[in-house]
Amino acid sequence: MHRYNAFDEEFVRVRNEQFRDQVKRRLSGGLTEDEFKPLRLMNGVYLQLHAYMLRVAIPYGTLSSRQLHKLADIADRFDKGYGHFTTRQNIQFNWPRLIDIPDILDALAEVNMHAIQTSGNTIRNVTADHLAGAAADEIEDPRPYAELIRQWSTDHPEFQFLPRKFKIAVTGAPVDRAVIRAHDIGLELLPVEGALGVKVWVGGGLGRTPILGEVRHQGLP
């Protein structure tokens, strides 16, 4: 699990300050909903029929006890006492008030969490096998590789305005618990010529038109 360094802390602090100002402008009428939409989506905020929803990133599905306690506290203080874990290992709060969301983001930052790139047409949360690090059939722990991809793709300028959202998953076991074939790119860690390599699946997806990805590379060293 990645722990924030000074750069991470400052980066998230500035992002949260910017969004706090954007929320104030929206509530005061300084921004229309159309103007506010791309700004809120960059911070994981959706507009539902009756309320806003905040989706929080849980990189490769790994939470510490401290982070889980913080999520429970946020649910009690700002929502209805519960959250909704998603298929791709995030958590959603479905009833926060817009005015409270900047405070929620600040609370998340206290435990090295944020909601960046959990919505919008960008590279989304990188997921992995939920038994990573503990599975008996694991060839390699996929979490360090998922973390490298997460760091590389977060706030990358080339990935902020993609045609559609883009999803990546990594597994290190022969049993596909990470459902890598249902992702735009699925990476399977495996032995290749006596060393660690990767099998690459591409073109998968769920949603309205689910499709299984196809193998692009059988084993890259």
Segments predicted by a language model, with ranges:
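Small-residue-enriched alpha-helical segments and adjacent helix-cap loops
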Residues: 24-31, 46, 51-195, 215
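Internal alpha/beta scaffold segment
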Residues: 206-221
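N-terminal start-of-domain structural block
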Residues: 1-5, 81, 221
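Charge-rich, low-complexity segments
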Residues: 1-42
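Conserved histidines in hydrophobic membrane contexts and catalytic metal-binding motifs
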Residues: 198-201
